[in-house]
């Protein structure tokens, strides 16, 4: 078997940049890492509770965290920020208070900014949420994968590969099904590839969804 590496980590420094930007002493590193995880979990939980969508898509593509001595800057890249802001003008303020409570940060300022992604379905995280929603509502996996590919075609992508693993359609034996459209050159480091692994809980058990999207070469 070929040894598979995470396409994002493989391309760090060429086409991919870090989602967390901060420095710390080695003894405080673990603490900083846990803090990042807390911020991300807190934001995801808040968005999950406060956005109601028919397709089950929360629309968070990624959360970037930049830390300085007295400031934590959080940038949330969302596909559909309207869902969070539209019906609640205080949405971002509430989120900020929630995160501050979770972190217990007294002497540091917290800034949260939300930016919109131009083509939401060109992002694997949002696409995985869409497929997960379809699988939960018992749509056949092939139909869900084809619909996802149709959505990415509107987002001007060069290629996509989707893989679903587990007890598909409630079958006794777990298996892996995958579909590819266009080119997905995983070995080319200069190829800009976005990747996501997502788990979805269905009534039959847990399914794993992996998505690779090829955006073009740099």
Swiss-Prot record:
Do you know which SUPFAM superfamilies this protein is assigned to?
Prokaryotic type KH domain (KH-domain type II) (SSF54814), Ribosomal protein S3 C-terminal domain (SSF54821)
Q: Does the keyword Ribosomal protein apply?
A: yes
The answer to whether keyword Chloroplast applies is yes
Q: Which domain of life is it from?
A: Eukaryota
Biological processes, Gene Ontology terms: translation
| Record keywords | Chloroplast, Plastid, Ribonucleoprotein, Ribosomal protein, RNA-binding, rRNA-binding
Would you tell me the Gene Ontology cellular component terms?
chloroplast; cytosolic small ribosomal subunit
Q: Where is the KH type-2 domain?
A: 47-118
For this UniProt entry, the molecular function terms from Gene Ontology, in alphabetical order, are: rRNA binding; structural constituent of ribosome
Its annotated compartments are: Plastid, Chloroplast
Major place of residence: plastid
Q: Which family does it belong to?
A: Belongs to the universal ribosomal protein uS3 family.
Q: What's its job?
A: Component of the chloroplast ribosome (chloro-ribosome), a dedicated translation machinery responsible for the synthesis of chloroplast genome-encoded proteins, including proteins of the transcription and translation machinery and components of the photosynthetic apparatus.
HAMAP family the record matches: Ribosomal_uS3_B
Assembly and partners?
A: Component of the chloroplast small ribosomal subunit (SSU). Mature 70S chloroplast ribosomes of higher plants consist of a small (30S) and a large (50S) subunit. The 30S small subunit contains 1 molecule of ribosomal RNA (16S rRNA) and 24 different proteins. The 50S large subunit contains 3 rRNA molecules (23S, 5S and 4.5S rRNA) and 33 different proteins.
The protein's name: Small ribosomal subunit protein uS3c
């Amino acid at each position: 078997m070929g040894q598979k590496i995470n396409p994002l980590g493989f391309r760090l420094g060429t086409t991919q940049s870090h989602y967390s930007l901060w420095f710390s002493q080695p003894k405080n590193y673990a603490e900083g890492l846990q803090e990042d995880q807390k911020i991300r979990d807190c934001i995801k939980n808040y968005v999950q509770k406060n956005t109601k969508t028919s397709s089950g898509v929360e629309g968070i593509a990624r959360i970037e965290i930049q830390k300085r001595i007295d400031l934590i800057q959080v940038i949330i890249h969302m596909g559909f920020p309207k869902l969070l802001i539209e019906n609640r003008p205080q949405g971002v303020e509430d989120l900020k208070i929630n995160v501050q409570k979770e972190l217990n940060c007294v002497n540091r300022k917290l800034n949260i900014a939300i930016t919109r992604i131009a083509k939401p379905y060109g992002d694997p995280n949002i696409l995985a949420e869409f497929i997960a929603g379809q699988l939960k509502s018992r749509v056949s996996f092939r139909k869900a994968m084809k619909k996802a590919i149709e959505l990415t075609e509107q987002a001007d992508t060069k290629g996509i590969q989707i893989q679903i693993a587990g007890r598909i359609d409630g079958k006794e034996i777990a298996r892996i099904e995958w579909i590819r459209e266009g080119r997905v050159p995983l070995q080319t480091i200069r190829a800009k590839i976005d990747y996501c692994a997502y788990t979805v809980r269905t009534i039959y058990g847990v399914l794993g969804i992996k998505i690779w999207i090829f955006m073009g070469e740099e």
